[in-house]
Swiss-Prot record:
Alphabetically ordered keywords of this record: Acetylation, Cell cycle, Cell division, Coiled coil, Cytoplasm, Cytoskeleton, DNA damage, Dwarfism, Host-virus interaction, Intellectual disability, Mitosis, Phosphoprotein, Ubl conjugation
Upper classification of the organism: Eukaryota, Metazoa, Chordata, Craniata, Vertebrata
Cysteines joined through disulfide linkages: none
Coiled-coil residue windows: 22-199, 242-306, 353-533, 676-703
Disease linkage: Seckel syndrome 6: A rare autosomal recessive disorder characterized by proportionate dwarfism of prenatal onset associated with low birth weight, growth retardation, severe microcephaly with a bird-headed like appearance, and intellectual disability.
Protein name per UniProt: Centrosomal protein of 63 kDa
PTM characteristics: Polyubiquitinated via 'Lys-48'-linked ubiquitin, leading to its degradation. Deubiquitinated by USP36, promoting its stabilization.
Residues modified as Phosphoserine: S278
GO terms of biological process kind: cell division; centriole replication; de novo centriole assembly involved in multi-ciliated epithelial cell differentiation; DNA damage checkpoint signaling; negative regulation of innate immune response; negative regulation of protein K63-linked ubiquitination; protein stabilization; signal transduction in response to DNA damage
Length: 703
């Protein structure tokens, strides 16, 4: 094209003029070159941009695949951590089950030992009941054993209460752990569901994105194929344009040759014109001469007759001259005909060249139309590429959002797992602290039991003092009875002496009663101080409510007035047989009340001392049962044990029943109590086993 343009320009400069077709063709060639160069640069830039976009997308796909692999690895690690936590929980449940089995075995051993002891006691009691009438020493030994068994039963009751406390604490811990495990299981199920939903959504999004990427790849491949097809078409068009350029060059060469021929013909034409002009000049001169000659002939026609020889000669000369002019004219005419034919040929060649130029212009128009169509197709491709870019951006944003949601979900799961591990660690710490606190509680209870035993020893000493006072009161009552008998027998004694003796005896009794009241008040203050100390310690340990303790104190073991009006011999017999501190107190107080009741109303504080001693003794008896008033889970067992204790004390306070019936009743009540306690413990252990099995099943079901 450039060579053709240069040739046309050179021709224009050389020839000095350009036709309109050549100028239009030059402009078209320039526009075609500019458009082809512009489209070529645009296509190169677009192909380079598409290649860079494809490379960037491939890198993004690689990064996304690597991120997906990392997320899959993190999910696997999380699954492993969850499995490890489940294994740890299973191990903890197995340890708890083993501990429960050990406790059950220990309880079974205790049951067996207790049953053996009961059997031995029954055997010994049967053997002793057979030989009771024979040996009083055997009865005392049996009573001592009964007291020992009673103390053991109290110890067992204390141990039972301790075990009940431990079992209640374990049950509370187990319930709390079960609730927490259920909560954790629900949270884990929710988290698993969330993870599954997130995984499903991520998989669906990944599949959707992969399908979109496949579609984009297909569209890219189709675009590449279209680009290749367009490049092929462009190459074909370039080839056709090159062929057209070659044809144009050939035609330009032909035009140059024709132009050269035209120039040569024009020169020949000019020469011929010059020759024609010269011939015309000659012909004109000849005509002028001919006219002159004709004039001369006309002038000489008159002289023709005269001079006949001269006209003939002149005519011959004219004929010769005209023959020569006609030959010259024929040659000039032949040259003119040749120039006309050459002009016609040149015009035909020019028309052919114009037709070829028209065909070339038509082909150029077609090429321009095809280029415009290709430009429109390129615009469409650009629009499609922009749409694809927008879709790819949307896909990238969706992938980033999915990754962010997945990462946030993973971070939330990690935080929850760390929180759960911290909670489990805190629970382990609380379990260890509860174990330590239970051991401390056991130590405190043992110390309190020792203090209670020391106080019981002090109470026994006080009761011994009361026995001595009782003996003195009996001695005084005997003296008073003797005085009354002496009053009836000795009538000669004056009333004044009797009144004086009576007043002196009353004063002695009043002083002794005042001394006894002081001693009892001192003991009462000491007992109140000791009970307050015990109450404070029990409040620190067990935190009982004041209302329950007051009701328990007011309703527990209140002696009736009719229970202390039995025969003194029977109470002494019961006291010596069972060594009951309640019987001792009632025996020590009843003679004073019998002696001093008909004498004066001033000796009524003995009833207060009696109630005080009974209250203090009831305190000593009710101390093991008052330790666990705050336990709501074992209120039924506590009420039953308190009823059993009240029945036992009421049975002990009845001095009418003989020794054998009391012992058999005591043993039967102890057997019933122990059997009932063992049944409750077995039922509670079975419930714990069932609940532990439920928790284990739940954990296994979660797996």
């Amino acid at each position: 094209m450039e060579a053709l343009l240069e040739g046309i320009q050179n021709r224009g400069h050389g020839g000095g003029f350009l036709t309109s077709c050549e100028a239009e063709l030059q402009e078209l060639m320039k526009q075609i070159d500019i458009m082809v160069a512009h489209k070529k640069s645009e296509w190169e830039g677009r192909t380079h941009a598409l290649e860079t976009c494809l490379k960037i997308r491939e890198q993004e796909l690689k990064s996304l695949r690597s991120q997906l692999d990392v997320t899959h690895k993190e999910v696997g690690m999380l699954h492993q951590q969850v499995e490890e936590h489940e294994k740890i929980k299973q191990e903890m449940t197995m340890e708890y089950k083993q501990e429960l089995k050990k406790l059950h075995e220990e309880l079974c051993i205790l049951k067996r030992s207790y049953e053996k002891l009961q059997k031995k006691q029954m055997r010994e009691f049967r053997g002793n009941t057979k030989n009771h009438r024979e040996d009083r020493s055997e009865i005392e030994r049996l009573t001592a054993k009964i007291e020992e068994f009673r103390q053991k039963s109290l110890d067992w009751e204390k141990q039972r209460l301790i075990y009940q406390q431990q079992v209640s604490s374990l049950e509370a811990q187990r319930k709390a752990l079960a609730e927490q495990s259920e909560i954790i299981q629900a949270q884990l199920v929710n988290r698993k569901q969330k993870l599954e939903s997130v995984e499903l959504s991520s998989q669906s999004e990944i599949q959707h994105l992969s399908s979109k990427l496949e579609r984009a790849n297909d569209t890219i491949c189709a675009n590449e194929l279209e680009i290749e097809r367009l490049t092929m078409r462009v190459n074909d068009l370039v080839g056709t344009s090159m062929t057209v350029l070659q044809e144009q060059q050939q035609k330009e060469e032909k035009l140059r040759e024709s132009e050269k021929l035209l120039e040569a013909l024009q020169e020949e034409k000019r020469e011929l014109k010059a020759a024609l002009q010269s011939q015309e000049n000659l012909i004109h001169e000849a005509r002028i001469q001919k006219e002159k000659l004709q004039e001369k002939v006309k002038a000489t026609n008159t002289q023709h007759a005269v001079e006949a020889i001269r006209p003939r000669e002149e005519s011959l000369a004219e004929k010769k001259y005209t023959s020569q002019g006609q030959g010259d004219l024929d040659s000039v005419l032949s040259q003119l005909n040749f120039t006309h034919t050459s002009e016609d040929l040149l015009q035909a060649e020019v028309t052919c060249l114009e037709g070829s130029l028209e065909s070339v212009s038509a082909t150029c128009k077609q090429l321009s139309q095809e280029l415009m169509e290709k430009y429109e197709e390129l615009k469409r491709m650009e629009a499609h590429n922009n749409e694809y870019k927008a879709e790819i951006k949307k896909l990238k944003e969706q992938i980033l959002q999915g990754e962010q949601s997945y990462s946030s979900a993973l971070e939330g799961m990690k935080m929850e797992i760390s929180h759960l591990t911290q909670e489990l660690h805190q629970r382990d710490i609380t379990i260890a602290s509860t174990k330590g606190s239970s051991s401390d509680m056991e130590k405190r209870l043992r110390a309190e039991m020792q203090k209670a035993e020391d106080k019981a020893v002090e109470h026994k000493e006080i009761l011994d003092q009361l026995e001595s006072l009782k003996l003195e009161n009996r001695h005084l009552s005997e003296m008073v009875m003797k005085l009354e008998l002496g009053l009836h027998e000795a009538k000669e004694i004056s009333l004044a002496d009797l009144q004086e003796n009576y007043i002196e005896a009353l004063n002695k009794l009043v002083s002794e009663n005042q001394q006894l009241q002081k001693d009892l008040m001192n003991t009462k203050s000491q007992l109140e101080i000791s009970t307050q100390m015990c109450k404070k310690q029990n409040d620190r340990i067990f935190k009982p409510t004041h209302s329950r303790t007051t009701e328990f104190k007011n309703t527990e073991f209140k002696p009736t007035h009719g229970q202390h009006r039995h025969d003194g011999i029977k109470t002494e017999h019961y006291k010596t047989d069972l060594h009951s501190p309640r019987g001792q107190a009632s025996d020590s107080i009843n003679p004073m009340s019998r002696v001093l009741s008909p004498l004066s109303p001033q000796i009524s504080p003995c009833s207060s001392t009696r109630s005080l001693t009974s209250y203090s003794l009831c305190k000593t008896h009710s101390l093991p049962s008052a330790l666990d008033t705050n336990e709501a889970n074992f209120s039924d067992t506590m009420s039953e044990s308190m009823n059993d204790q009240e029945e036992f004390i009421s049975s002990c306070s009845l001095p009418v029943s003989p020794l054998g019936s009391i012992a058999t009743r005591f043993l039967e009540e102890e057997e019933l109590r122990s059997h009932h306690i063992l049944e409750r413990l077995d039922a509670h252990i079975e419930e714990l086993k069932r609940e532990s099995e439920k928790t284990v099943r739940q954990f296994t079901a979660l797996k």
